[in-house]
């Protein structure tokens, strides 16, 4: 099946079934960033239905490019498998089923790009588990970091969002430490941060 047809089908499925995927306003930036860094080894937390993995796959290093993607939800994991199996990238994408906080403790590989797009309140905890496996100069992308304008805006978040907003603020404070990362935050969609890791000895 042609990749564009699969992506269109995924967009429709996501809209009908209320599955969070990259917003249209973010897709161009996302593809530009992946194309710019052209990673060989990618770790994604939060596969959902495999939309972002299939956006990344054709932009990776042609010979060695590989994506490892983690998803907790049973239905989304199966849908991601279904869509990826229809594509030409089945050999380039490995899906792992489970809670990322557990799966990440079992990592053995090294990654030059990480995409955080799972539970927003877990970003910092997950990054701390991932960093020992990130190559110096590796890139960490995190989606939804501005969370409806509450994280860096003047708006007071509703009570139900206060914990997630506080944790995203803590995440941004961490990745904006200039001794550890060079970080840029893009306002598209719900905000995406791009952090270049300076290495373990900094």
Which residue ranges define each predicted feature?
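A short alpha-helical cap/connector motif
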Residues: 1-113, 120-141, 145-202
């Amino acid at each position: 099946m042609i990749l564009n047809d699969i992506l269109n089908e995924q967009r429709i499925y996501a809209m009908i079934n209320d599955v969070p995927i990259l917003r249209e306003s973010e897709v161009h930036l996302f593809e530009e960033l992946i194309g710019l860094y052209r990673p060989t080894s990618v770790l994604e937390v939060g596969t959902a239905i495999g939309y972002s993995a299939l956006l990344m796959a054709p932009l990776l290093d042609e010979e060695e490019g590989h994506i490892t993607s983690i998803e907790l939800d049973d239905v989304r994991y199966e849908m991601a498998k279904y869509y990826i199996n229809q594509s030409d990238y089945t050999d380039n994408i490995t899906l792992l089923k489970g809670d990322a906080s557990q799966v990440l403790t079992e990592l053995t590989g090294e990654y030059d790009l990480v995409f955080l797009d799972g539970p927003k309140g877990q970003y910092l905890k997950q990054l701390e588990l991932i960093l020992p496996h990130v190559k110096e100069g590796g890139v960490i992308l995190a989606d939804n970091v501005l969370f409806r304008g509450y994280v860096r805006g003047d708006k007071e978040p509703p009570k139900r969002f206060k914990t997630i907003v506080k944790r995203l603020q803590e995440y941004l404070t961490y990745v904006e430490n200039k001794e550890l990362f060079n970080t840029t935050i893009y306002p598209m969609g719900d905000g995406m941060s791009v952090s270049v890791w300076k290495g373990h000895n900094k």
